[in-house]
A protein has these predicted regions:
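Short loop/turn motifs that connect adjacent beta-strands in outer-membrane beta-barrel proteins
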Residues: 24-34, 75, 109-122, 154-157, ...
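Gram-negative (and chloroplast) outer-membrane scaffold detector with strong preference
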Residues: 74-143
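Residues on the lipid-exposed face of transmembrane beta-strands in outer-membrane beta-barrel proteins
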Residues: 39-43, 66-70, 102-108, 127-131, ...
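Outer-membrane beta-barrel translocator domains and adjoining extracellular loop/strand segments
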Residues: 49-55, 59, 90-95, 116-117, ...
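Short glycine/proline- and aromatic-enriched beta-strand/turn motifs that initiate or cap beta-hairpins
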Residues: 1-67
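Residues that define the transmembrane beta-barrel architecture of outer-membrane proteins
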Residues: 33, 58-64, 96-100, 119-121, ...
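Residue-level detector of the transmembrane beta-barrel scaffold of outer-membrane proteins
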Residues: 36-38, 77-79, 122-126, 159-161, ...
Length: 220
């Protein structure tokens, strides 16, 4: 009977193992991890129905926004956003408004976290629903929000942010136009900062194969 004795290189088996990461796999976020707060300011233009006679630049008014949200994965997040100040209606009169909406964000660059620990750029289209309050006439219509947000990470806790967003609601939001028919729009361009709270970042999943092999050798 011929017996084969497996050969192990002892020095090789006892060497510290360098981690090998699974391609495209990150660990899920904890409940307290990857929260964020965003503060931004810029300008907005109201494009209502009826439109009125002014061009786009004549409709611009200052605006600001404040958002709180969380990233659940490197690609998927959600936020609650508040914005407001004033807009020019179809007669070019100033009206006060407040807008709150919940958005789903999709970071199209999130896949990079599966290949490296730190990613500086985020590009996230978003869409959501909310409510507009016209403080001048009391209207509170349902809204659809949408846009795209870009971020550049300055440090672990702070990112610079630029956002182009839009809102669509019913034509009579400003007191003019037909009720129960979509046709009033708000377009905004804002810039500001995002502050990252809690545990920040994502852990890449480690391939355990080499650790299992070493453990089996030690047991044998």
């Amino acid at each position: 009977t011929v017996q084969h004795t497996p050969y192990y290189n002892v020095s090789e088996e006892l060497q510290p193992i360098q981690p090998v990461y699974l391609d495209g796999v990150v660990l899920p976020a904890s409940l307290t991890g990857n929260w964020f707060v965003s503060i931004a300011g810029g300008t907005s233009a109201f494009l209502g129905t009826p439109l009125g006679c002014e061009d786009l630049f004549g409709r611009l008014k200052p605006s600001y926004s404040f958002a709180v949200g969380k990233w659940f994965t490197p690609s998927v997040g959600a936020r609650i956003n508040y914005s407001g100040v004033q807009f020019k209606d179809g007669t070019l009169s100033n009206q006060d408004y407040h807008h709150i909406h919940a958005d789903l964000l999709w970071n199209v660059l999130g896949c990079r976290y599966a290949r490296q620990e730190q990613v500086r750029w985020n590009l996230a289209p978003f869409a959501g629903v909310g409510l507009l309050h016209n403080a001048s006439n009391g209207n509170n219509p349902f809204t659809v929000s949408y846009g795209v947000q870009g971020e550049y990470r300055i440090s672990k806790r702070v990112s610079a942010m630029l956002e182009l967003s839009g809102t669509t609601t019913f034509q009579d939001f400003d007191g003019y136009g037909r009720p129960n028919r979509l046709g009033d729009h708000m377009v905004s361009l804002t810039a500001g900062f995002t502050f990252h709270l809690g545990k920040v970042g994502w852990k890449r999943a480690v391939d355990a194969t080499s650790y299992i092999r070493q453990n089996e050798w030690l047991v044998d």
